[in-house]
C-alpha cells in the first residue's frame, strides 16, 4: 500500500503530553493511527499549529510519520476556545503548504481542523475525510450541571464540515447516528471505524502485586482510579460522590480505600481541580 495522507489536528500537537492542557486521547488516537498506516507503507504528515518556539518546523516522530508546524498566531496563550479567531489565517497557511507538496487525502480531526482544511481540499481537489471526536449538539444535549453550552460558532462550523467532507469517520454506531440525525450527514458518507487497543501497552505485565509495589500501594488496598483530563463531563465528581456514598454504607472500607485521580486541568478550566479538592 502506498500513498500520502495530510492529517490535520490544529488545536493540539502529537508532541504534547496527553492528559495536560488540551492534549488528550485524540493525540494518542491520531499518532497511533498514523503509525499503523505508516507500517503499511502510507506516509503520514500531521499538521498542527506551532505552540513551542524551540521545536523544528518538521519533526519525524516515527518512520513514515512526521509533524509539520503551521506558524500562525502567538506561540503561547492561545486556548482552544480562541482558535476560531485564527481559522482564516490557518487555512491560508495550510493551503499554501499543501500546494507546495503532494497528498492523496486530507484527514482532519475536530471541527476547527475541518474548517481549516475545507479551502485547501476545495482548491486543490483533494478528498477531505473528517473525524469529529466530539460534537457540539451532542454535548449540549447532555450538559453536566453548571456546564457551559458549546457556542453557536462551533455548531455552525461542524455543520459546514459535515456538508463539505467527502467522508466522515465515526468511532461508534451511536456517533454515526448522531452525525445523520443531528447534522444531516448522508449515511453513505459515514463510516464506523472502531478504535483498537494496543495490547503491548495495556497488559497485566508482571501482575497486580508487582504493580502495587512499584506505585507504593498496599496489597490489600481497594483502589478506584480516574484517568483523564479533569473536565466535568468526564465524571471525576461522580467518582468522588460515589466513593463517599460507598463509605457511608460500608464505613469499614475507609481504611483500605484509595482514590486516585490522574490527569491535569483541560485548557483554561483550571478551577475544576480546586473545586474537586474541596
Kindly give the residue locations of the regions a language model identified.
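N-terminal subdomain of nucleotide-sugar transferases
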Residues: 1-69
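Active-site proximal beta-strand in glycosyltransferases
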Residues: 5-6, 121-141, 169
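Short His-centered aromatic/hydrophobic patch
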Residues: 108-113, 132
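Membrane-proximal helix-turn-helix segments that form the acceptor-binding/catalytic region
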Residues: 149-168
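Carbohydrate-associated surface elements
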Residues: 174, 196
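A short helix/loop element that forms part of the nucleotide-sugar donor recognition site in Leloir-type
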Residues: 203-217
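Conserved donor-binding/catalytic core segment of Leloir-type glycosyltransferases
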Residues: 218-234, 240-244, 259-260
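Short, structured helix-loop element that forms part of the nucleotide-activated donor/catalytic region
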Residues: 249, 255-278
